Amino acid sequence: MKILTGTVNELLNELKIETDTNTSIQVETEVKTIIEKVKTAGDQALFDFTSKFDGVGLTELRVPAADIQAASAKIEPAFLDALQQAKVNIESFHSKQKQHAFLDSEKDGVIRGQLIRPLETVGVYVPGGTAAYPSSVLMNVLPAKIAGVKRIVMITPPGENGINPYVLASAQLAGVDEIYQVGGAHGIAALAHGTESIPKVDKIVGPGNIYVATAKREVFGLVDIDMIAGPSEIVVLADENANPAFIAADLLSQAEHDILARAILITTSKKIAEETQNEIDKQLENLPRKAIAQKSIETRGKIIIAATTQEMFDIMNEIAPEHLEVQLENPMNYLYQIKNAGSIFLGSYASEPLGDYFAGPNHVLPTSGTAKFFSPLGVEDFTKRSAFISYTKEALAKEKDAIVLLAKKEGLDAHAKAIQIRFEEEN
């Protein structure tokens, strides 16, 4: 890892904060073609693309309930118990996020209020590839269930032996209503437009590769999406009292995701910087995903030595990381200095994987600096708000002149007339 020193501005310039757009012109062109084919050919396009991209010849898209039950029966009880414990924690945290309707009748003859309604149908994308992510199923599905979404449709690409049984078991535990064995940009297109087998949804959530991310960007507006996620990120803030072995392990926990993952340590201690570097080298040797983690650390990893604790927070807030660990003495004292971070881990024993799997807060987080204006996935992402008003004639009479004046100043005479006509019989 490269060690950086200097002023805040020099460090930020050296860091050259990358905003990963997770797309390219070539990919965008390919994705548009895929979406159009799914839009016109429906299920047949999904069969063709699954054969082409996944090397799997399908005869049906929906995973039968019997297959889901059989997959769950194969899973070791200890894993199912761990999954159940995680589910309880995720549900207990997200249940506190529920928004509430309100009714305001403070003014005579006036009723105003807000309704909160769940989305009808949500599509959840679960990646395939070299790793299975049952935790991603829980994190995307459970907030939707708590919000009251009636129909949750999951898609995931099949492998040679079908869908990973741990993913299926997680989907059953979370309460997914339908599962389809299709992935990629063609799967996103199916959720956005609907096919003979797959329903059109109101919103698509879940992570994926560059094709999935680009497809989500393309269909946004036809349906809602959660966010466009880039490679995983972690920033660790550490003082001289931090444990270098803990820091190194947490940095590597993100580096093993992807060669484009970003792992950054910001510290006021040169000793901690050097010892963490040594720990990373040592721990890398025993990692099964060493090649990925090492490439990430070498090309995207950074150690920044700041002059003061305040500088540490200034740099971190500009980075706006997906994951932030505060390994400082009395970490709670610094909570309100954090302006921009997706998920925050306070203290040496609040390790980032605790949030990935178990503690309860969501692990679907803004990346690439977007924590400056985006939030983690939550219950509110699966609801919508509607306002309502009711006025008596007497209440409207008190306010009609002001309304007419505003409408006429905007040149919208029909708006003004709509108010005036209700009182014309009195003149």
UniProtKB/Swiss-Prot annotation:
Catalytic reaction annotation: L-histidinol + 2 NAD(+) + H2O = L-histidine + 2 NADH + 3 H(+)
Function, in words: Catalyzes the sequential NAD-dependent oxidations of L-histidinol to L-histidinaldehyde and then to L-histidine.
CDD domains from the UniProt entry: Histidinol_dh (cd06572)
PANTHER family tied to this protein: HISTIDINE BIOSYNTHESIS TRIFUNCTIONAL PROTEIN (PTHR21256:SF2), HISTIDINOL DEHYDROGENASE HDH (PTHR21256)
Enzyme class: oxidoreductase
Cofactor(s) this protein cannot do without: Zn(2+)
Name of this protein: Histidinol dehydrogenase
Superkingdom of origin: Bacteria
Similarity field: Belongs to the histidinol dehydrogenase family.
Binding locations of Zn(2+): 254, 257, 356, 415
GO terms (BP aspect): L-histidine biosynthetic process
Gene Ontology MF terms in the entry: histidinol dehydrogenase activity; NAD binding; zinc ion binding
EC number: 1.1.1.23
Involved pathway(s): Amino-acid biosynthesis; L-histidine biosynthesis; L-histidine from 5-phospho-alpha-D-ribose 1-diphosphate: step 9/9
Stored HAMAP family: HisD
Residues annotated to bind substrate: 232, 254, 257, 323, 356, 410, 415
UniProt xrefs under PROSITE patterns: HISOL_DEHYDROGENASE (PS00611)
Positions annotated as active site in the UniProt record: 322-323
Gene3D superfamilies in the cross-refs: 1.20.5.1300, Nitrogenase molybdenum iron protein domain
Keywords noted in UniProt: Amino-acid biosynthesis, Histidine biosynthesis, Metal-binding, NAD, Oxidoreductase, Zinc
